[in-house]
Amino acid sequence: VPNRNKIFSSIIQSVALSIANETKSPVQIAMGIHAGDHAIYPDCRQEFRDADYKAFCEGNWDSERVSAYTPYLDVDKFDILKDGESCCECLGIDFDEVYKRTNTSYKPIKFFHTSTRWKWYSDYKSASSVERIEAFIKLGRPDPVAYADETGPVNWETAKIHAEELLYDWAVDKGRD
């Protein structure tokens, strides 16, 4: 999605500045942009974030009350998952319960399910899903999110094998360059 992080940051910057002005206190925006997206989305790079913040400051009075927190700017999804695992442990919450409720898929799939009527699943073939699956493989634990394809729900092993095959093919192709 071209320019998506600029769109998101514009919205959140305006909300944050409104809150900062109303409360007369600073507001920090947390953004989950990460290094894994740098090659695909230029608006995930530090240079873009700096330019975006400069434009925000130039266009708004009291903009210094708003700052950005981008803890994952230089790390990939694996490092984000490690941090999430650590945070869940510190907070005493179940990692799987948290992460089964997240969906990074650009192509979620909706299927009828007898107990819940309609249920949304993550696809496991899109680039964002493969990147997520790769991070869970590196972490050494199954991804608790529900996956599906055009035929219906699939288990973690199916999603994992598909991602591993794609990653292997990509590595082989990259070696030919």
Predicted regions span which residues?
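Nucleotide-activated chemistry modules centered on ATP-dependent adenylation/adenylyltransferase
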Residues: V1-D177
